[in-house]
C-alpha cells in the first residue's frame, strides 16, 4: 500500500471518531482545556495549551474527512507524477498545521499553525515548477506575510498582560481600548488569510497548484483559517466600528467576486472566485454577530466546494489539462457521472432546497432580513446571491450543454473508480450534510417571521440570476459580443477591480519607476550639478582668486597701499 491509501484510512478513521466525540461535546456542552508542560527548568516552564470543544472537534473532523478524500483522489489524479509521495507528505503537513491552528487557544501556537499553513501552501502552489507557479506562489506568500506580521504584533502587544491565552481576555478586549488594538490586528490577519479586499488577488492566483490542493485549500483549510480565528474572537465584532467595518469589507468582497466570476473563462478560477464570494458571505454574517451561523455555513460550504473542485479536476484531467470553459461543451454526454455530481454541487452552491447549501444560505438571508442593516448591505447580500446563481448557470451552460468545442481526438469518459469514489462520497455529503448539521447544531429552531414578499425575495433573486446567466451565455451564429460595447466596465469587473494589477505591478513597478525618476532627477541631475561637480568648480575658482592675492608682487602691494591711503585721505577731508 502506498502513502495515499495509508493516509486515507488513517485520516478517515480519526475524522469519524472526532465527529462522534464532537456530538457528545455538543449535546452535553463540554469544554476541555488541557495544559501540557512540555519542558520545565527550575522556575521556568514551557506549557502547550489545547482547547477541545464541540466547534474545534467538529471542524477538525471535517478537515480530516475532506483531506482523506483528497489524498485518495490524488492516488489516481497524480499517478503519473514522479513526486507523488512528496506531494502527499506536503498535504499531511498542511493538515497538521491546520489542526494546530484549530485546537490552540494561545496566540503563540496559533502562529505556529498559521505560519505552517503559509509555508506549506507556498510549497504546494509552486509544485508544478514553472514561471506562472512561481509568481503565484510569491504573491500568495507575500500577501499572507502581512497577516503574519499582524499576529506577531498582537503577540508583542499581549506582553503587556499576563498571558498569551486569548480566551482569558475576550471580555476585556471588547471594552478596553488598549486591548482593542489586539482585536484590530487579529482582524487584519484574518482579512489576509481569508482574502478579503484589498488582499483578494492571491486567491485566484493560487489556482496554479494541483487541483486536489485547490479542493483542500479552498474548502476547509487555508482560506477558512482567518474566518475560524474570527469566530473564536467573535466577541470583538460586537464593538460597533469593528463590526460595521468588517460588514462593509466582506460585503464588497462578496459582490466583487460574484461579479468577476461572470466574466471569467478559466474553470478553476470561476470556482475560486465562488469561494471568495462565499467567504465574504460568511465574514459578513459573522460581523453581524451570528457566529454559529457562519460556522454552519463554513461546514456545509466545505462539502460542496470540495466536490466542485474534484469534479472540475476530473474534467480537466480528461480534457488533457485544458481549463477554458469555451473549449468544453456537451460534457454531460461524455462524462455523465462526473457531470451529475458537478451539477449537484452547483445546485448546493446556489441554495437549491434540501441540499447542503440551502439550510445555511437561506437561513443567513432570512436573518439578514430580520436584522437592522442598511439598504446598501441588504443590496449586497441579495445581489451577490443572484450573481452566484448567474455564474453557476453560466458555468453549466458552457461546459455541459451544446456541442463539443475541443479537439476531436480527446477520449472523453468518466474517471476511474478511485476518483469517482471520492466524488460520490462528497456528493452524498453535499445532499444530506446540510440537513444533518442543522438538526444537530441548532437544537432550538430559529423563529423567522417575515412578510411574504420578503420571504420570496430570495427565490425571486435566484430565478432572476439564472435567467441573466442564460442570457449572458446564449450565443449563436452572427452573435455580437455585448461585452465589447461596455469594454471598460467588463475589463474592470473581470479583473477583480484591478486588484491583481495593484497587488503586483502597483507594488513593484511604480516604486521602481519612482526610484528611477529620483535617480535620474537627483543623483544624475541636480544633485550632480549642485553636488560634486558644482562644489569642485566653485572651490577651484575661489582658490584661483585667492592665489592672485598671494602672488607677492611689490607693484600690487604698493597699489593696494596707495588705494587705501587715498580712501582714508578722502574720509578725513569729508569729515573736516
From Swiss-Prot:
EC number, as in UniProt: 7.1.1.2
Keyword Electron transport: yes
Biological process annotations from GO: ATP synthesis coupled electron transport; electron transport coupled proton transport
InterPro entries: NADH_DH_su5_C, ND/Mrp_TM, NU5C-like, Proton_antipo_N
Keyword terms: Electron transport, Membrane, Mitochondrion, Mitochondrion inner membrane, NAD, Respiratory chain, Translocase, Transmembrane, Transmembrane helix, Transport, Ubiquinone
One Pfam family named in its UniProt record: Proton_antipo_N
Location in the cell: Mitochondrion inner membrane
Catalytic activity: a ubiquinone + NADH + 5 H(+)(in) = a ubiquinol + NAD(+) + 4 H(+)(out)
Membrane-topology annotation of the record: Multi-pass membrane protein
GO molecular function: NADH dehydrogenase (ubiquinone) activity
Bilayer-crossing regions: 6-26, 46-66, 88-108, 109-129, 149-169, 179-199, 211-231, 240-260, 270-289, 294-316, 339-359, 363-383, 423-443, 459-479, 492-512, 556-576
Cellular component annotations (GO), alphabetically ordered: mitochondrial inner membrane
Record family assignment: Belongs to the complex I subunit 5 family.
Primary role: Core subunit of the mitochondrial membrane respiratory chain NADH dehydrogenase (Complex I) that is believed to belong to the minimal assembly required for catalysis. Complex I functions in the transfer of electrons from NADH to the respiratory chain. The immediate electron acceptor for the enzyme is believed to be ubiquinone.
Protein name per UniProt: NADH-ubiquinone oxidoreductase chain 5
Taxonomy of the source species: Eukaryota, Metazoa, Ecdysozoa, Arthropoda, Hexapoda
Encoding gene, per UniProt annotation: ND5
